[in-house]
């Protein structure tokens, strides 16, 4: 296996981890309406747990309001119950046509809790990035035949620099999300 294959495989896995960070951070409530807050909440739809985003349109008509327009009006009560049971602290209101969710202001205490959650998720993903680096280093050790010590060291340095750049990306996303949470 060539060094380029090891590094490109590592980058692919790390890109997926960055996408997971963005998705995880999207589910953290910030006081602003964002469809990702509710789109993955599962609703019992004819015996199948289905995400809300497959049951209707989610729009943001105002900065602190989400509107869900279900395709099937008969499921509105179930969507409402699923949102209330989600643990996000959201109170949906159903007018028979759409479900409106007003996003309440965050308290200072809740902002601190959310910042801790963001840091925790960030640290989990940094560990995942480091594990990907470890796997790449192990792959390199298995395929060192025909490589000089200098070539091996150069490849190890590239793996480390790539890892550092992805950890920096996670740190930047974390700082951005924390700022979003703590900004009133």
Swiss-Prot record:
An example Gene Ontology molecular-function term: ribosomal large subunit binding
Superkingdom: Bacteria
GO biological process, one term: translational termination
GO CC entries: cytoplasm
Cellular localization per UniProt: Cytoplasm
Family note: Belongs to the RRF family.
Function: Responsible for the release of ribosomes from messenger RNA at the termination of protein biosynthesis. May increase the efficiency of translation by recycling ribosomes from one round of translation to another.
Name of the protein: Ribosome-recycling factor
Species whose genome carries this gene: Leptospira borgpetersenii serovar Hardjo-bovis (strain JB197)
